């Protein structure tokens, strides 16, 4: 993974690198590989993830069709 450092601005380069790693799923992969996961636990986790994905897709579809109200956006103070 490569990040350009402009004008010796290392803070910005680190932010860009972290964002790229997050998008690629590197942090999640490192967390998953930090300890051994038994095959039975892996099956359970993958099944739960699949259920979560299908529920999310169904919820998004209902929101698009107007049957469910869309989530309210919360304004955050910066």
Swiss-Prot record:
Keyword Manganese appears in the UniProt entry: no
Entry-linked Pfam families: Ribosomal_S21 (PF01165)
Domain of life: Bacteria
Keywords for the protein's UniProt record, in alphabetical order: Ribonucleoprotein, Ribosomal protein
GO cellular component terms, semicolon-separated: ribonucleoprotein complex; ribosome
Segments traversing the membrane: none
GO molecular function: structural constituent of ribosome
Coiled-coil annotated residue ranges, if any: none
Chain spans, region Disordered: 58-78
Identification of the protein by name: Small ribosomal subunit protein bS21A
Lineage: Bacteria, Pseudomonadati, Pseudomonadota, Alphaproteobacteria, Hyphomicrobiales
């Amino acid at each position: 993974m490569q990040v350009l450092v402009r004008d010796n601005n290392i803070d910005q380069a680190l932010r860009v690198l972290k964002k790229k790693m997050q998008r690629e799923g590197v942090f999640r992969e490192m967390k998953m590989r930090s300890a051994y996961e038994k095959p039975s636990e892996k099956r359970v986790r993958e099944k739960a993830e699949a259920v979560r994905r299908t529920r999310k897709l169904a919820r998004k579809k209902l929101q698009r069709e107007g049957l469910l109200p869309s989530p309210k956006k919360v304004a955050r103070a910066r």
